[in-house]
Amino acid sequence: HKDLFKFILNTINDKNFCWQCNRIVSEEKFQSDLKYNKQFAHKIYPPLGLYNEHYEIFQLVLLDLNIEELLRMKLNFIPRTEKIIRHGFHIDTEEYSKTSILYFNTNDGYTEFEKTGEKVQSVANRIVTFDSSEKHLGTTCTNDYARLVLNINWK
């Protein structure tokens, strides 16, 4: 697992890895200044085109999750900010499923769950899994160049 994790981390940190800038959540859900409602993303599945060249690598992450159907897999690169910015509470999909978040770097950012108030700290190679109907939010970090996570929605 550590070798796979390191290989993926090197892949996404490569200067030729393609990221697209997009909004994190809808404007009405965002909890801070809208200028911070941005992240860079790389959609692994379903691919934006016919094929994503990195899909096979990331498919190996799924082996431990007992997945019957993959709905979505997306990398998020959330740039560092001077103070922690909380993004809005949201669900990833209306469809009954699970969400797993794999953290790629250790930093002071976190995932927070609305119902319980629990915060899961961003720790490299940690994965958290929960019902997709559970409202959650992510944050920026202040002590690394970015917060890097893989978001997986599955059944």
Question: Which residues make up each language-model segment?
Answer:
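Non-heme Fe(II)/2-oxoglutarate
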Residues: H1-E68
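Catalytic core of non-heme Fe(II) oxygenases with the double-stranded beta-helix
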Residues: P46-K155
